[in-house]
Structures are given as structure tokens and as C-alpha cells.
């Protein structure tokens, strides 16, 4: 069957259409993405403003049209932290569902972590043993670990790259003071993960998903003679301050770094470094599957019941 996944995230609105059948690998056939940066439309009361709502409606309208043209039999739309945490998010979702006749659902942070973990487990297989899976999104950080398809521990923290950039970083290049405040905040937020560190200590493989981490893996590979498919702690320790010293224009000229990603990559790098250091992870392996694939896999599993 042809399934569409509509991911309403903090950075982008991303439609992916898959040809998916029980017992087979989901094959992507159509991809449509609009960079939106919803977090930049939040006002002082944590409401998405009128301009942001308009941009969101236009992006979803385009995605729904693309899904219909692609012959999508079932559309699975979901929203993550930007709509989940905005004060008027529920009202916006009701209006969108009514206007476009879809069923946009909000995923909890824990759901994000669990579905991403499922995708990583299916990709690497049972022989990969105990996994810890890390995803740095625009609005939140997800960490999950376990030996089965459902993780034993799943955590979501407000440490997304877009959120932190807006909240802490200023100047071009970013000021040392704002970088220091950012790093102190990351460390304080990670305390809750460290309290549950026992869940993550024994592992066979540490896995990374998300565009932010893929970009960092590529940069680590280019700068430190890596393979572009892993992130080593030693490399991320070196790359984080180098990125922070660059201007926005300089970062946007780096391979694989879009202008939008150039704003956020500094915060993402410091989150990655802090997570790896605090959880004693020497190396992260990149996984090409993540949340959207997890949603597809969960839907197929549900159909088989």
C-alpha cells in the first residue's frame, strides 16, 4: 500500500510517501519538504502568531496536495514539540484538521523516543544487542535504550537545536557569554538523564538519528578524516568550538549545511558533545531511519493485529 507520513516538526513540514507492505521494507517514493522554523513564530506568551499559522496552513496545504497527487492511500500526520508546547497548539490543530480533513495527532516526547527507537531497532536488527538511540530535533532531544523493540527507558528533554539557538545564542559569531549560558543550561537539563544513567550504561551500540547529527557526522568526517557515518566524542569536542567561532555565513558554506541548519548547528553540536560525554559514549553510529519510519512501521504492525 502507499502510505504518507506528514511530519509537522519544529524546523520543517516534511511529507514522505512510502510503498509499504507487511513483512517488507518501507520504500520511500516521494519526498516534499518546506522549511518553516515554527519556533521563530512564538510570541512572548508562547503562542504561534498569525504569520506562523498562515505559513503552517500553506505548508500543510501543499503537502496534502502532493500526497493526493502521489496516490497516497493513508496519510499519517503527526506534530512534535513546536505544536505540542505552544499555548495555542491544540486550537491550531483543530482548525487544520477541520480545514484539510486530516487527523493531525500530537506525539508526546516519549512517543517520539519510542518510535525512533523502533526504527533504529528494525534497521540494525536483533543481533545489534542493547541499543541507545539519540535524536536531536529542532525542539527536543530524545534518548531511548533497550534490548527489545520497545525501549526500557525513553526520555525527551527541551534541548532541540532550534529552541536553544533562539533562547540563548546571540551575536555573529555567537558571543562567548551566550555560548557559556547555553552550555550551562544543557548540563542542568541533562541531570534528569544522569539520574537514570543505569538504564543506559550497558549497551552494545550507540545510535544517532536526525538531520542535525547527520550533518555533524559529515563535518567530523571532512575535518577529522572520518567516514561521515559516525561521530566520535573526540571529534565533536574539537568541532563544537570551531563552529561557534564561525560567522553564520561561514557555517552556511560548509558542506551539507543549509542556511537554516547553519543557525542551529552550534547548539546541536554542544548538545551532542554533552550527551556523549555524560553518558560515556565514545562513538555514535548514524541510522538512516528515524521517527517517520517508526510511524510507518508502527502502523503496519497495528494492521497485522
Residue spans for each PLM region:
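N-terminal basic/disordered segments at the start of proteins
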Residues: 1-27
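Short, glycine/acidic-enriched loop or turn micro-motifs at the edges of active sites
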Residues: 10, 138, 211-214
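Helical "lid/coupling" subdomains associated with nucleotide-phosphate turnover
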Residues: 3, 17, 36, 41-72, ...
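Acidic, divalent-metal-coordinating active-site segment for phosphoryl/phosphodiester hydrolysis
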Residues: 139-145
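Dinucleotide-binding Rossmann-like beta1-alpha1 core, especially the glycine-rich loop
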Residues: 77
Amino acid at each position: 500500500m502507499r502510505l504518507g507520513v506528514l511530519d509537522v516538526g519544529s524546523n520543517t513540514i516534511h511529507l514522505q510517501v512510502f510503498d509499504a507492505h507487511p513483512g517488507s521494507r518501507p520504500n520511500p517514493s516521494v519526498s516534499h519538504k518546506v522549511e518553516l522554523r515554527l519556533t521563530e513564530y512564538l510570541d512572548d506568551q508562547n503562542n504561534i502568531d498569525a504569520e506562523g499559522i498562515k505559513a503552517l496552513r500553506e505548508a500543510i496545504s501543499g503537502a496534502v496536495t502532493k500526497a493526493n497527487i502521489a496516490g497516497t492511500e493513508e496519510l499519517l500526520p503527526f506534530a512534535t514539540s513546536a505544536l505540542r508546547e505552544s499555548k495555542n497548539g491544540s486550537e491550531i490543530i483543530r482548525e487544520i484538521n477541520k480545514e484539510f480533513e486530516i487527523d493531525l495527532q500530537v506525539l508526546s516526547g516519549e512517543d517520539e523516543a519510542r518510535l525512533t527507537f523502533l526504527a533504529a531497532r528494525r534497521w540494525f536488527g536483533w543481533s545489534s544487542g542493547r541499543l541507545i538511540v539519540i535524536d536531536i530535533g529542532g525542539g527536543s532531544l530524545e534518548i531511548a535504550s533497550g534490548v527489545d523493540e520497545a525501549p526500557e527507558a525513553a526520555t525527551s528533554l527541551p534541548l532541540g537545536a532550534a529552541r536553544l539557538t533562539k533562547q540563548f545564542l546571540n551575536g555573529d559569531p555567537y558571543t562567548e557569554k551566550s555560548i557559556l549560558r547555553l552550555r550551562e543550561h544543557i548540563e542542568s537539563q541533562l541531570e534528569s538523564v544522569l539520574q537514570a544513567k543505569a538504564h543506559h550504561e550497558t549497551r552494545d551500540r550507540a545510535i544517532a538519528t536526525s538531520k542535525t547529527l547527520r550533518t555533524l557526522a559529515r563535518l567530523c568526517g571532512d575535518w577529522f578524516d572520518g567516514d561521515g557515518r559516525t561521530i566520535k566524542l573526540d571529534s565533536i569536542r574539537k568541532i563544537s568550538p570551531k563552529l561557534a567561532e564561525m560567522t553564520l555565513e561561514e557555517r552556511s558554506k560548509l558542506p551539507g549545511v543549509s542556511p537554516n541548519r547553519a543557525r542551529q548547528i552550534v547548539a546541536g553540536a554542544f548538545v551532542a558533545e554533552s550527551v556523549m560525554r555524560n553518558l560515556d559514549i565514545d562513538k555514535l553510529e548514524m541510522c538512516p531511519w528515524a521517527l517517520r519510519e517508526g510511524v510507518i512501521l508502527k502502523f503496519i504492525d497495528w494492521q497485522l493485529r
